């Protein structure tokens, strides 16, 4: 890893003694394997960068952090790994001090940028889950880019001690020109401090963030289950609409739910069929005004049937009044209310029209003559029912949008979990060994140290493989670029 540096493999005298023995033809198979890992790392990270650049679906704020991580991994695979292999097969560093400092700078900067990229990615996922509405206003590409630039800026601060350590501290007395190592390679306190700040502290914070993310997603899932248990789903509304139709045909049966219809499929209920528009989305229901005139009003349909009782002022139950009735019976009176409501939620507009139909008993007569008390209770009840139904629809719309958001965050949390798991498993062995060497120089084991270093480098190879496993858009784009048929 950057903080001890690849060349720290040969920092200690005990490790240096093993270095010459490793430079032999027997290293050829190892060099081939390590070179293959380097090439695969470069190829996969270039594939990720090209996929994000070419596919518009991947142009998201969250993927900007993935791009930052891929750039850091690309530097590791294209610069750090090859020069590590080159130094492994050489008996001494013969490429000059400037190239050595360049390699050390790339090692430290790229490795630190990789850690910080995972860290800010974790913070982004954490805020998206914990504060979805508040953070949504601030989660822009500009702010994400500024955060990424800040992470890379702090990573580039490593250049100061690498190039200018001798300006602040006296140079190491044992520094040799035939070795590629930093001026602070033997400063234990500085190495421990940088390891804590650049690895242990961010890793602990990431683990804490991820625990919070896991609990938040789990809490949202439980809340959604409880909400779905108390309110009907859209499919339940459709099933209950069928029950409402049957209730309208059978006297004495009441249905508490409205009928939610698709205008292009279901016929209207309680409306004059001749007045229906040919447009599958628009209808022209018949409306009876207070003066008894017949009107036609265009509107979008959302038919709601509810059986209402006839007001006492409209019913004359006595036999004398029945005999005095001079006009024919009116078996059905339709009170229609059309309302167009629109609400935008994630670029989707919900347009609803609600129609209230009241049916009287066939044996009930209504007297239109003078002195008749006209009750408006049916109309008021219809409007109240429209408000209740609208609240239900609005609640379901929010639940649907919340469900989409929850699914996205669940997948993002899963992707972050895999990235963090690979990161910790690959780098924790090196840093444990690094801390041991810092306190016990005689404990250096050359093969083990090299193994932990390259295990950390392999993390840059694994990251591009994690993205398509956890993101369907990445998977489809990779298949499209590589011409792989599903």
Curated annotation (Swiss-Prot):
Annotated histamine binding sites: 107, 112, 198, 430
Cytoplasmic compartment segments: 51-64, 124-144, 212-415, 469-486
A Pfam family annotated for this UniProt entry: 7tm_1
Transmembrane segments: 30-50, 65-89, 98-123, 145-164, 189-211, 416-439, 446-468
CDD domains in the cross-refs: 7tmA_Histamine_H1R
Location (main, coarse): membrane
Extracellular side: 1-29, 90-97, 165-188, 440-445
Record-level Gene Ontology MF annotations: histamine binding; histamine receptor activity
Membrane topology, from the record: Multi-pass membrane protein
Compartment(s) of residence: Cell membrane
GO biological process: cellular response to histamine; chemical synaptic transmission; G protein-coupled receptor signaling pathway; G protein-coupled receptor signaling pathway coupled to cGMP nucleotide second messenger; G protein-coupled receptor signaling pathway, coupled to cyclic nucleotide second messenger; memory; negative regulation of steroid biosynthetic process; positive regulation of nitric oxide biosynthetic process
Sugar-bearing residue positions: 5, 18
Similarity field: Belongs to the G-protein coupled receptor 1 family.
PANTHER family on file: ADRENERGIC RECEPTOR-RELATED G-PROTEIN COUPLED RECEPTOR, HISTAMINE H1 RECEPTOR
Designated name of the protein: Histamine H1 receptor
Native organism: Rattus norvegicus
Biological classification of the source: Eukaryota, Metazoa, Chordata, Craniata, Vertebrata
């Amino acid at each position: 890893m950057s903080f001890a540096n690849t060349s720290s493999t040969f920092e200690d005298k005990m490790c240096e003694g093993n270095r010459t023995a490793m430079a032999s033809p027997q290293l050829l198979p190892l060099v081939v394997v390590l070179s293959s890992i380097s090439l695969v790392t470069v190829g996969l990270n270039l594939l990720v960068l090209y996929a994000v650049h070419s596919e518009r679906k991947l142009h998201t704020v969250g993927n900007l952090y993935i791009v930052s991580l891929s750039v850091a991994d690309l530097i590791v695979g294209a610069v750090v790994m090859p020069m590590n292999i080159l130094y492994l097969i050489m008996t001494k560093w013969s490429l000059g001090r400037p190239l050595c400092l360049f390699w050390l700078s790339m090692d430290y900067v790229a490795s630190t940028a990789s850690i910080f990229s995972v860290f800010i990615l974790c913070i982004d996922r954490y805020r998206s889950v914990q504060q979805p509405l508040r953070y949504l206003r601030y989660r822009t590409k500009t702010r994400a880019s500024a955060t990424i630039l800040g992470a890379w800026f702090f990573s580039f601060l490593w250049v100061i001690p690498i190039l200018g350590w001798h300006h602040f501290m006296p140079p190491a007395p044992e520094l040799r020109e035939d070795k590629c190592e930093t001026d602070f390679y033997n400063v234990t306190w500085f190495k421990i401090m940088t390891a804590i700040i650049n690895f242990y502290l961010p890793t602990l914070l990431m683990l804490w963030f991820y625990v919070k993310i896991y609990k938040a997603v789990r809490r949202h899932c439980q809340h959604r289950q409880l909400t779905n248990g108390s309110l009907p789903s859209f499919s339940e509304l459709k099933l209950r609409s069928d029950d409402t139709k049957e209730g309208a045909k059978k006297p004495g049966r009441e249905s508490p739910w409205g009928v939610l219809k698709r205008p292009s499929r279901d016929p209207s209920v309680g409306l004059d069929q001749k007045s229906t528009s040919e447009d599958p989305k628009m209808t022209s229901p018949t409306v009876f005004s207070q003066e008894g005139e017949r009107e036609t009003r265009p509107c979008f349909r959302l038919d709601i049937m509810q059986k209402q009782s006839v007001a006492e002022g409209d019913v004359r139950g006595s036999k004398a009044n029945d005999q005095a009735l001079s006009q024919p019976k009116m078996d059905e009176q339709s009170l229609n209310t059309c309302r167009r409501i629109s609400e935008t939620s994630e670029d989707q507009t919900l347009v609803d029209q609600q129609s209230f139909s009241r049916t009287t008993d066939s044996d009930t007569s209504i007297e239109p003559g003078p002195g008749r008390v006209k009750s408006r209770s049916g109309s008021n009840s219809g409007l109240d029912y429209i408000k209740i139904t609208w609240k239900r629809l609005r609640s379901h719309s929010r639940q649907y949008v919340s469900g989409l958001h929850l699914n996205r965050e669940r997948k993002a949390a899963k992707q972050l979990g895999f990235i963090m798991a690979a990161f910790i498993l690959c780098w924790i062995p090196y840093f444990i060994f690094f801390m041991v060497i810092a306190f016990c120089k005689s404990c250096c084991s050359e093969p083990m140290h090299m193994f932990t270093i390259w295990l950390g480098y392999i993390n840059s190879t694994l990251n591009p493989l994690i993205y398509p496993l956890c993101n369907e858009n990445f998977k489809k784009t990779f298949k499209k670029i590589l011409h792989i048929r599903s």
